Amino acid sequence: MTSRALLLLASALLGTPGLTFSGLNPESYDLATAHLSDGEQFCQGLTQEDLQGDLLTERERQGIACWSCRKILQKLEDLVGEQPNEATINEAASRVCRNLGLLRGACKKIMRTCLRLISRDILAGKKPQEVCVDIKLCKHKAGLI
């Protein structure tokens, strides 16, 4: 009786190679009856792998933050004009975020948290890239001091 049970078990395992170690049950292994099982277990691995390709690396995330900062500060510099002073910078800062679309939220946060440093840098004649380095949204580039 015991040998018969072992033989039955062995034939079941050999009939579905890899099934024992995959964590799948026979219903999800057979595509014709896969809809009868939970199904989430089968798709979960695919979903996780597919999403991993869409996740941003730290380097990409920093690049996006730096690009956004430069765009925002370039717009601010354009609004401030040729002869910046504290009043023109504050006036421009209050208007700069209005027409930036997707960058509006980031713009508001930058203006709220960093305006004092941004003002100081603009008054010192620094360019948007340099200001973004100072507020730590960009890294130093080669040749930029």
From Swiss-Prot:
Identify the PROSITE patterns for this entry: SAP_B
Instruction: Answer yes or no on keyword DNA-binding.
Output: no
Residues annotated as coiled-coil are none
Signal recorded as keyword: yes
Which region is the signal sequence? Answer: 1-22
> Pro-sequence positions in this chain?
23-62, 141-145
Q: Function, please? A: May be an effector molecule of cytotoxic activity. Has antimicrobial activity.
**In terms of one coarse class, where is the protein primarily found?**
secreted
What UniProt keywords apply to this chain's record, in alphabetical order?
Antibiotic, Antimicrobial, Disulfide bond, Secreted, Signal
Instruction: Give the matching InterPro entries.
Output: Granulysin-like (IPR038847), SapB_2 (IPR008138), Saposin-like (IPR011001), SaposinB_dom (IPR008139)
Q: Which cysteines are joined by disulfide bonds?
A: 66-138, 69-132, 97-107
Per UniProt, subcellular location reads as: Secreted
- The Saposin B-type domain extends over 62-142
Q: Which Pfam families match?
A: SapB_2
A single GO CC term for this protein reads: extracellular region
Q: Which organism is it from?
A: Equus caballus (Horse)
Q: What is this protein called?
A: Antimicrobial peptide NK-lysin
Among the record's GO biological process terms, what is one? defense response to bacterium
